[in-house]
């Protein structure tokens, strides 16, 4: 049957018009077809194409054998080839493109053919035209597209319909795209009508033709959709996808396999978007029609008993439905719905199948599920970062479940949480276990909801329980650590006590050693002096002995002479000669030089000659140095002269001086000098004059002060006010001269030679002037209290600082960038107000009283009612000082509620009326018999409170002592002060506070007052970040200053008051014990127990006093070290400043970390957004590589390519970046993105790090601007 031409399509009409025309007319027809019409050409055979292109085409077995019969034609016999010689190259290229289109080749296979030479292209077109003509001449062996349409509309059934569909499938596979286009939407509609009719009809037998016909229609649809035209036409139909979904019947496995593959291919199409959602809608509609779950057919196809190919096809469709979705919630929802239907159990069975295609699909499913699970955990991290307010999170949860089926379950969860056992240690364990369970339920590792229909929910809690056990062990270890810390504190206290005792013992021993050493030195000097005196006396005795012997001999000679003279006088008559005076004896050794005149002879009337003048004083040494007279012997005794000789003999005077030599007066000598005294006699006590100074010596030491009674040189007159002082004496001959006096003695140094301007002052202690910085711009200036060189001392901290070692250009550039602006910020102040609570006391009526007033009796009755003991037993407990019964509160209440002594005395007189008295007065009668009750109670109270007072005072002393030692020893804190000094001097450049040698420690708390340019950072935050990045060792100083916090709570004034109060109380108790009357009751142990207590308390107090003294000494030394006045700055204020700074520094570190996390989060969000967009474009491009539905032309083999990509898994590979290396369950917020995220964008955004030497301010400024831009 010949179909009409002209109305069925351009290809068919052209072929009908060319019917009966000769081959000579083909070129013109070809030319016209290239312009306005299109040839309907038959496909070339593979062996003929190979002759030109060396390319083979798949599926040769499906090609008709008639082509082989026509392939033997030679090119020389082809009249078309001869006629093409006259066709232009442009027309040949047009025919060539039409040939490629009719050959049903895709773009990849067309490209090599286009690269051929024009001669080869002309031959290919010629041969193609010839074979097409030969095929058209065989109308009896083939049907046209319209014939198939008419047959499909004729109502064929069963076997005839099956034969027609099989023939149609072959034609759709073998004919060119133009034939498919001719079949077009009309033919497709006919196929879909038959398929719908078959779906609606119920099969009576399993092997009926309906199932085979439906399967053959699906195969025809697959062939029809193997090109872009067919896919577009199929997608334009309303029920095409639904009919494919209805064809997924596990009872017909082969048909379900083909239908699932077609639907999978449609799901991954790039255009139109959301094709997977259209397929899901069709599956939902089919489920509503059949009243089953929409994924139930897929689950039935995956269950055991089906073929592996069906299982692979169903799992492939599941992957195709989930993977293309962009929204995480959508993917998790689909996967969760499948899990609820039992996919989890089915997957376990599928994993046991050894099949490569199955393994590919399982890997795709698992990988996508794991990635979605990581995305969920990443979302949890974002929730933890952004939603940290309890009320806000609860309100959001309540709004999500309100008025829904989940609301009662949410309420039940909250109610169950109220049943958690209220135990301090157990409650956190409960919540940790609940959190882990919820985490595993919500964040399932396969990225889906759990199977709610299954009774068994597998939650891995063994590891969590092990962690809880380990945590319990850790808590026990922490408790032990706390206990050990207490022991450490006690050991530290004991160490300080021992140190104080040791220092006291050392000082006592040193004092004793000094005393003994002084006594030893005194005895040694006395011994040496006695030895010297002994030697002098022995020499003197030996000399006197010699003189006595000599005089004795002279006396003997004189006696002999007198005897001879007497004998001569007897013989010679006497005469009266003039008697010459006997010369005086020479002075004895050791005498003062005064010559004792001899006694006058009897009868001599002449006056004895005057004694010689005393020897002149020794001449003064040059420079006014004089030698004092020798001191007398110890005890003020002098060497007594020898006894006078026996008889009337006199010692002759010394011989006269040489002639012409006289003793001039001191004033007559030039220069006022006196004649040097004669050398002393042997044994003289005078001190020899000092030797002259050696050449080059520094001078002669000043003379000792003159002894009392001696005449010495008068002191020089004091210098006039403002005068230059006493000029130095001239130098000795040959000597270098006497150096000028040191500074401060009133003599300014001489000006430099040739100039009158004074030189720069020399800094003390080896200090060097501080470097003066000149920033490029003016910075915000820290307002510190500057310390100048005159404020420093030799051993203070600021004389040893070397802040220059922290200096670098990068630091100054950051300072300039951060603190260049000058903006004023206001600081809000918050006032705290506290409320007062009032207590009301109810009053009770009491019985009539005789001595006590009602209020006193009432208070005493209340006290006695709370303390249930007989009155006599209370008395005995007080007498015995029984500390096992007595408590501090009891004694305090007794002292407070006890009646006055006068009232007790009056009550004691009413002891005969004891039974008639009220209970409070009965108690007063009993207690009135205790002697000195109130002092006794005060002493007992002090005894009970003494241990507590010691335990309160001692830790405070130890804390301050340890804090002082830690500050002196902390190297990291010293480095922080040096860095702060460097930064402050740089920022204060050009101001009055520049060039500081140090600063007041209190300035540390003011670091946060200096704001950055953008008001987002303070100087404290800058220093914290600087230390964190460049000097991490400085961050250890909070740990090194462990006792600063405790020391900040210590009030030195209160500590002193407590010690003074303790001393007073000990003295009062000691006085009371001494003045206490003798005990009249055998149970009275007050004196006995208090005596030993006073002794122990005194020892404890002395120890505390020494520790307190040591603490004050250390704090005073700390003040000298850091240059502050300990009297003006109390211990509490100083350590409170340090404690506040320590906390502020730690807070600044945390805030810097949080700021970096926020910046990182913003950067991650930006990168994630860019990455998501990039992934979307890459995904779109990859899917377009499979098929571009918007491109021009009719590409063929599309369905084959899609199915091949689905089978290999290439269609499912989402390039979303590795997450395992970057995200883990419960990961910290500060974790960075994967290296893939930062490889492209972050490396381009963040400039490369340059060396510190080459880093300049503009580079830092650019980085900061870029950082601010990314943050905003």
Curated annotation (Swiss-Prot):
Annotated Gly residues bias: 1-12
Modified residues (N-acetylmethionine): 1
Primary role: Actin nucleation and elongation factor required for the assembly of F-actin structures, such as actin cables and stress fibers. Binds to the barbed end of the actin filament and slows down actin polymerization and depolymerization. Required for cytokinesis, and transcriptional activation of the serum response factor. DFR proteins couple Rho and Src tyrosine kinase during signaling and the regulation of actin dynamics. Functions as a scaffold protein for MAPRE1 and APC to stabilize microtubules and promote cell migration. Has neurite outgrowth promoting activity.
Modified residues (Phosphothreonine): 768
Biased composition range(s): Polar residues: 67-84
Name the record gives this protein: Protein diaphanous homolog 1
Family stated for the protein in its record: Belongs to the formin homology family. Diaphanous subfamily.
Domain FH1, residue spans: 583-764
Name of one Pfam family that matches: Drf_FH1
